[in-house]
């Protein structure tokens, strides 16, 4: 059995998990998330804990039990606490402004770049050079943060661009004569 799948998922107070034949739904303060259940994994719920076991002894079922356990754990954490990703804009004149479900970026192009946020994702700008992406779905938060970063990734010579707050950019040395 997968080492990850051996650990049960603890369901905190205020979070409701329903396991149907083909769907796992997690409902909480942060919203509702659902996931298709894999036929290779048996999910059992008892005394506030979810347990995941492979349906058979195949390697694929073993691996899938650990994967499904971690996905459900991320859903439970997302609806109870939420996830956030911080980005910073480095460069002269680079700034961001959040207006409702849109993010406006001025990052050195001849035009401002507007990015629409999907439902369930909120974006804030505490300062003009910081962007915070929040949401209940860990995968979507990371995906939106990656799309924002892709507008102007950090360049290796001066480090200008959009980067994750905890990202370290290795600056290259310029060509010498």
Swiss-Prot record:
The keyword Metal-binding does not apply. HAMAP family: Ribosomal_uL6_B (MF_01365_B). It comes from Verminephrobacter eiseniae (strain EF01-2). GO terms for molecular function: rRNA binding; structural constituent of ribosome. Part of the 50S ribosomal subunit. Keywords: Ribonucleoprotein, Ribosomal protein, RNA-binding, rRNA-binding. It holds the Pfam family Ribosomal_L6. The gene is rplF. SUPFAM superfamilies: Ribosomal protein L6. Transmembrane segments: none annotated. This protein binds to the 23S rRNA, and is important in its secondary structure. It is located near the subunit interface in the base of the L7/L12 stalk, and near the tRNA binding site of the peptidyltransferase center. This is Large ribosomal subunit protein uL6. One of its GO terms (biological process) is cytoplasmic translation. GO terms for cellular component: cytosolic large ribosomal subunit. Belongs to the universal ribosomal protein uL6 family. The keyword Ribonucleoprotein applies.
